[in-house]
């Protein structure tokens, strides 16, 4: 009897390919004979002999699946979409990461610049890419601004993307023309309150991280100042040096050379602590507004993909950012490592978006 059952069981296993469907309950492989010395009733024996063809047939399928190795990742070239023009900070971040990532993965890493629409053009490319982790997008604060400032985005910021990590961050500088009679946040606030609505602050765009930082500063200190947007950081800096705007709210990379040369006066940085590039310029937080922080940052996201792939990308970017040559390159741009886990970065993106939504709706700001 035992021999007969063994033959039948082997036959069932060999018929796995003929199974019509997967089992609707957990797979069981049951020996229908009691162990020696074990008293089994006829009812129990009947249950033990109830072996379904479907249960037995699926076992070799599962074993075969378990023995097949997972497809390696990445299995082709990686793409990094930088939704900014060549030569800018985001482009530098992408290209600086590309070399160590290429070495780590043994694949080419191609950087593509796709500027336009406040980074929405590049984001759309990634949103439509295969959900396999092979196409990354370098994002900045504008990624968390667009959902509320641009009507009818061709993607869903919070459903179509998954955070990999924040990569680096840098401070934003509040600077004034040397002719303005202020040398501190306290003096700037006093002057602005004495002349409500007269002082202006220039930014690199109508609605980006610098504009948000300027509005957060205005709100925190309780003054009325007017934004003057420019098409880029260079013209905004030039306007401030020429006295066409009262203040400049700009990335430390763009404004630090002018502050160090005395062509602009640094009033404060928006990081929690002083920036290494401008160690003599205090933070807003230490100038009487504890906890104030408004950073410029760059991170990496992919189209929503399996968690193991995202974690692998995260691990390699974290390793890359700690390499001395990468740190040096980032430091030359005034940027410091600011990495996170994928889950923390997703939460950070949502927190930034929630804050930006409040500012945008309060001021009724739009990007047409």
Task: State where each predicted segment sits.
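Positively charged n-region of N-terminal signal peptides that target proteins for export
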Residues: 1-4
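Bacterial N-terminal signal peptides
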Residues: 6-16, 57
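N-terminal (or domain-start) structured segment
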Residues: 20-159, 198, 222-251, 258, ...
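An extracytoplasmic/periplasmic, membrane-proximal ligand-sensing/linker region
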Residues: 22-26, 61, 75-77, 220, ...
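Hinge/capping helix and adjacent helix->loop/strand transition within the periplasmic-binding protein
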Residues: 128-134, 148-235, 284-286, 295-329
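Beta->alpha turn/N-cap motifs
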Residues: 138-143, 203, 232-233, 250-255, ...
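A ligand-binding cleft/hinge motif common to bilobed small-molecule-binding domains
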Residues: 143-152, 211, 216-220, 246-281, ...
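C-terminal lobe and pocket-closing loops
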Residues: 255-322, 351-354
């Amino acid at each position: 009897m035992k021999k007969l059952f063994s033959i039948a069981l082997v036959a069932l296993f060999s018929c796995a390919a003929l199974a019509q469907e997967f089992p609707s309950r957990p797979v069981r492989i049951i020996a229908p004979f009691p162990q020696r010395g074990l008293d089994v009733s006829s009812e129990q024996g009947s249950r033990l002999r109830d072996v379904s063809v479907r249960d037995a047939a699926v076992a070799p399928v599962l074993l075969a699946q378990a023995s097949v190795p997972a497809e390696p990742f990445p299995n082709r070239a990686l793409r990094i979409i930088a939704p900014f023009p060549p030569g800018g900070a985001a482009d530098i971040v992408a290209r600086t990461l590309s070399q160590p990532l290429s070495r780590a993965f043994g694949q080419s890493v191609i950087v593509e610049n796709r500027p336009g629409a406040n980074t929405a053009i590049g984001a759309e490319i990634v949103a439509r890419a295969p959900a396999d982790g092979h196409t990354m997008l370098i994002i900045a604060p504008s990624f968390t601004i667009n959902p509320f400032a641009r009507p009818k985005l061709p993607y869903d910021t919070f459903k179509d993307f998954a955070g990999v990590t924040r990569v680096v961050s840098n401070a934003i500088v509040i600077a004034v023309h040397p002719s303005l009679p202020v040398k501190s946040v306290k003096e700037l606030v006093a002057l602005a309150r004495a002349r409500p609505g007269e002082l202006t602050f220039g930014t690199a765009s109508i609605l980006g991280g610098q504009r948000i930082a300027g509005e957060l500063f205005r709100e925190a200190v309780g003054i009325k100042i007017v934004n003057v947007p420019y098409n880029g950081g260079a013209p905004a800096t030039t306007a401030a040096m020429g006295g066409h705007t009262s203040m400049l709210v700009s990335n430390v990379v763009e404004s630090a050379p002018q502050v160090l040369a005395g062509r602009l006066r640094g009033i404060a940085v928006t990081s929690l602590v002083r920036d290494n590039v401008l160690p003599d310029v205090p933070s807003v937080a230490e100038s009487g507004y504890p906890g104030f922080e408004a950073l410029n940052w760059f991170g990496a996201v992919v189209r929503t993909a399996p968690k193991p792939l995202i974690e692998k990308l995260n691990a390699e970017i974290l390793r890359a950012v700690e390499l001395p040559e990468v740190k040096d390159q980032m430091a030359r741009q005034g940027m410091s490592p600011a990495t996170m886990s994928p889950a923390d970065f997703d939460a950070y993106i949502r927190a930034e978006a929630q804050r930006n939504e409040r500012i945008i709706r309060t001021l009724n700001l739009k990007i047409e």
